[in-house]
C-alpha cells in the first residue's frame, strides 16, 4: 500500500515575510563575487536515460540515500533541500539569480523569520521536499501506467508489461506479443532474461493480496517506486543486502558494505576514487546506518535508513546538513554560511569569498 506522511501547513504574517524577503534580497544584491557552477552532466544524462526507459524501475530514486545497486546517492542532500527546484541551479544559471533563489529558499525554511535555520526547521523542510518528490512520482506514474495499459481497463498483466518492456529494448512489439500469446520461447539474450526474472520478482511483490498478477495504477507505482510502499521497501532492502552480503547471513558487516565494486580501475586516479568510495561508505555505515553501533547492519536498520519519510532520519540529516556549514558553531544555519557552502546545498558554488558578505553588509 502506498503511503505518505501528510505535511502540516505553515503560515506566517505577510508583513513579516515581506520584510524578511527584502532583508535577504538586499544581502544578495551586495554580492558580486564570481561563481563556479557545478557539473550536472551526470544528472542530466540520468534524467535523459530515465525518459527513454520510463516503464523500467529506475536505479536512482529521488530523496533516497542508496541507489538500487547499493551505491550512495551523491545528489541526496541537494534533492531533499531543493526538491523540484534542482534544475534551477544548473551550470547555465546566472550566479546572482541563483543566489537570489537560494535566499528565497532560506526564507521559506526559516519559518520563525529569525534569520537562521534550526534543525527542526530543516527537518520539516526535508520532509516537505521528500513529499514533493513523491507527488512528482505519482504524477509521472499516471503517464507511465497509460503506456503499459493501452486498453485502459485499469489493470496491467505481467505479459502486457513484458511486451512493452521488450519493445523498449528494441524488439518488435507485435512479434513479441504473438510469441507470448502462442506460448513460444522468446528469443532474447541471457542478460535480458536475467532482467526479466528480476522484474517478475518485483512484479509479484507489488501485487497486493489477493494476488492476481494484475497491477493497478497504485500497484504499478509501488513497482516503479518501492521507496513509498512499506512492503516494497522491504523487498528493495532485501535485494540490496543480497547483492552486498558475502557470507550469506542476511546482514551487512562494514567490510561487506565498503567492498569495492567489480571492475575497479588500477591506475592512481582509480585508486583515489576507490579511497573516496571506502571513506564515504565507512562514514555512512558507522554514523547513520548502524544505529546501535554494533558493527552489523540488519535489514531493519537498512530499511529505517532508506525510508524517505522517516522523521527521525530527517532530523539526523538536518543536523548533519547544518553542521557542514555551521562555522560559528551555534547549531543553526545562517545566510552567510549557506552561501559559502552553496555547493553542498545546490551543487553550484555561488560565491568564492563569503566573508565579503558580512564585511559589505
Swiss-Prot record:
One of its GO terms (biological process) is calcium-ion regulated exocytosis. It is found in: Golgi apparatus lumen. SMART domains: EFh (SM00054). Ca(2+) 6 binds at residues 326, 328, 330, 332, 337. Its main location: Golgi. Keywords: Calcium, Exocytosis, Glycoprotein, Golgi apparatus, Metal-binding, Phosphoprotein, Repeat, Signal. Glycans are attached at residue 39. Induction: Down-regulated by ethanol. Down-regulated during the progression of cerebellum differentiation. The modification Phosphothreonine is found at residues 192, 216, 264, 298. Pfam families: EF-hand_5 (PF13202), EF-hand_7 (PF13499). Gene3D superfamilies: EF-hand. GO terms for cellular component: cytoplasm; endoplasmic reticulum; Golgi lumen; late endosome. A membrane-associated isoform is expressed in acini of the pancreas (at protein level). Ubiquitous. GO terms for molecular function: calcium ion binding; identical protein binding. Ca(2+) 5 binds at residues 290, 292, 294, 301. Coiled coil: none annotated. Ca(2+) 1 binds at residues 110, 112, 114, 116, 121. Residues 1-35 form the signal peptide. Ca(2+) 3 binds at residues 212, 219. PROSITE patterns: EF_HAND_1, EF_HAND_2. Residues 97-132, 136-171, 196-231, 232-267, 277-312, 313-348 form the EF-hand domain. Ca(2+) 4 binds at residues 245, 247, 249, 251, 256. Ca(2+) 2 binds at residues 149, 151, 153, 155, 160. The keyword Repeat applies. A membrane-associated isoform interacts with STX3 and STXBP1. This is 45 kDa calcium-binding protein. It comes from Rattus norvegicus (Rat).
